[in-house]
Amino acid sequence: MDIRAAEISAILKDQIKNFGQEAEVTEVGQVLSVGDGIARVYGLDNVQAGEMVEFENGTRGMALNLETDNVGIVIFGADREIKEGQTVKRTRAIVDTPVGKGLLGRVVDALGNPIDGKGPIQSTERKRVDVKAPGIIPRKSVNEPMATGLKAIDALIPVGRGQRELIIGDRQTGKTAIALDTILNQKPLNVEGAPEGQKLYCVYVAIGQKRSTVAQFVKVLEEQGALEYSIVVAATASDPAPMQYIAPFTGCTMGEYFRDNGMHAVIIYDDLSKQAVAYRQMSLLLRRPPGREAYPGDVFYLHSRLLERAAKLNEDHGSGSLTALPIIETQANDVSAYIPTNVISITDGQIFLETDLFFQGIRPAVNVGLSVSRVGSSAQTKAMKKVAGKIKGELAQYREMAAFAQFGSDLDASTQRLLNRGSRLTELLKQPQFSPLKMEEQVVVIYAGVNGYLDPLPVSKVRAFEDGLLSLLRGKNVEILNTIRDSRDLSNETAAQLKSVVEGYAKTFA
C-alpha cells in the first residue's frame, strides 16, 4: 500500500485548521471554614460585593463580607455538602431574577426558581434584585386610589397607587387577611381585555412562614381566581436565612418590571420582622458588630432601600406605579420597638391592628385612632371624599365621648345621639373575610351611615340593613352604582336619587 507523505500532511493540516482551543479562565478560591450557612473563602481577590459564587457541588452563595484576607459568603442552600478545601468559583454576575408576565400565576423561591411543579418559567428577561430606587425627578405625588375593598381602610386610611402603607399588629390580628382581601379586590380590574392602566398586578412575598400557611394562601388565591394576576415568592421558615433575606428584594424586582413598563403593581411583604431577624442572624455570623436589640447598624438601610423602590412615576417615565404593603409583627402591642419604629418612619402611614378589637368582634381589627395615611384624601375618589370626611369626624368624637361616658351615667341628649351614631358606624365598618366591596358600594353604605339612616336601628340589625340595601341597589337601582363608578363622584342629582332609595328602603326595613 502506497502512503504519500503529502496526502498525510494535507489531511493533518486540514484537521488542525478546524481545531480551535479556547481556554476558559475562571477565578477560583478555597473554602477556609464553613458552618451555620456561612463560608469563609480565600483567594477570590476580585469578587464584587453581592456577587453570586458557585461551590463545587453546584450550591450558590453570595459574597457579603469583603475582608483583607478572606471573603465572607452566605450560602443559598444547605452547607452540609460543602467541605473545607473545596474550590469556589466566581460567576461574575450580581444576584438576579427572572422578571415579566411569564411569572404571573406562579410560585417561586427567593431566587426566582419555580417551586409549584408547573414546569419552567416562561420569561426571557432577568434583572438584578438589589437596584437603586428611582430618584426625585422621575417621581410624582400619589394621586389615584389603590382600593383594598375594605370599608375601614378605603374610607378612613386610604392607600394610593405608589404609596407605602405599613400593616402592623400582634400575631393573629388579621394582617395577612387584609393583604389577601386586597389581592382579591383587584379581580374586577384584571379582567381580560381591560386597559393596562387600570390593571393592578399583585406580588406576595412570604418570609419565614410555615409551608402549610403559604400553601393555604396559594390555594385561596387559586379558588378565588386571583392567582392568574399574582406572583407568590416564598422563603419559608425552613429555608436558609440568606433566602429569607433576599426574598423581598426578588419580589420587589418582579414588581418593578410592571412599574417601569407603565403598568401598576402592589407588593406585600409578609413580614419584614422575619427578614430583619434573618439579616441579624447573617450579620452576627459574619462577625459584624451588633447594635440595638443585637440588630446590625444597617438594618434601617435594609428596609429603607427596599421600601424606597415603591413609587409612582410621572408621565415622562410611563406613569407606572409600585405600591408596597409591608407587614410588621409586634410583640404585645409594642410599637416602640426597634424594627416597628424604623419601618413606621420609612412608610407613608400605618394600619394598626389590635388584639382587643379582634376579640371584640371588630374585624378588620383596625384601630382608627392610631392608624394614619400620610397621603390622605388625594388617594380617594371625589365620591368617597364626600362621604368619608364626615365619618372620620364622627368616629373621632365618638372615641373621645366613649372614654368620658364610662365615668358618668347621665348624658345629655346630644352626647347620647353621638354615642349611638358612633356605635352604629363602628358596626358598619365591620366586614367578613373574602367579601371586598367595590368603591361605589362602599360609598352608598357609608352614605346611609353618616346621614343617620342607621340611628333608629338596633346595632345587631346594621349588617342586615347593609346587605339588604346593597342587594336592592345591585338589582333594581344598579344605574346609581354605575353612575358613581363611572363619574367617581357623588353629584347632587345622584345623591338625591340615592337619598330617595335609602329612605324608601329604611321605611320598609323598619
Swiss-Prot record:
Cross-referenced NCBIfam families: atpA, PRK13343.1
Feature type site, description Required for activity: S371
Residues reported in the UniProt entry to bind ATP: G169, D170, R171, Q172, T173, G174, K175, T176
Chemical reaction(s) catalysed: ATP + H2O + 4 H(+)(in) = ADP + phosphate + 5 H(+)(out)
Protein's name according to its UniProt entry: ATP synthase subunit alpha
Keywords recorded for this protein, A-Z: ATP synthesis, ATP-binding, Cell inner membrane, Cell membrane, CF(1), Hydrogen ion transport, Ion transport, Membrane, Nucleotide-binding, Translocase, Transport
A GO term from the CC aspect: proton-transporting ATP synthase complex
Coiled-coil stretches noted in the UniProt entry, renumbered to this chain: none
Assigned EC number: 7.1.2.2
Gene: atpA
Chief localisation class: membrane
Family annotation (InterPro entries): ATP_synth_asu-like_sf (IPR023366), ATP_synth_asu_C (IPR000793), ATP_synth_asu_C_sf (IPR038376), ATP_synth_F1_a_nt-bd_dom (IPR033732), ATP_synth_F1_asu (IPR005294), ATPase_a/bsu_AS (IPR020003), ATPase_F1/V1/A1_a/bsu_N (IPR004100), ATPase_F1/V1/A1_a/bsu_N_sf (IPR036121)
Family according to the record: Belongs to the ATPase alpha/beta chains family.
Membrane topology: Peripheral membrane protein
Organism lineage: Bacteria, Pseudomonadati, Pseudomonadota, Alphaproteobacteria, Hyphomicrobiales
Organism: Rhodopseudomonas palustris (strain BisB18)
GO molecular function terms listed in the Swiss-Prot or TrEMBL record: ADP binding; ATP binding; proton-transporting ATP synthase activity, rotational mechanism
Subunit description: F-type ATPases have 2 components, CF(1) - the catalytic core - and CF(0) - the membrane proton channel. CF(1) has five subunits: alpha(3), beta(3), gamma(1), delta(1), epsilon(1). CF(0) has four main subunits: a(1), b(1), b'(1) and c(9-12).
Function: Produces ATP from ADP in the presence of a proton gradient across the membrane. The alpha chain is a regulatory subunit.
Compartment(s) of residence: Cell inner membrane
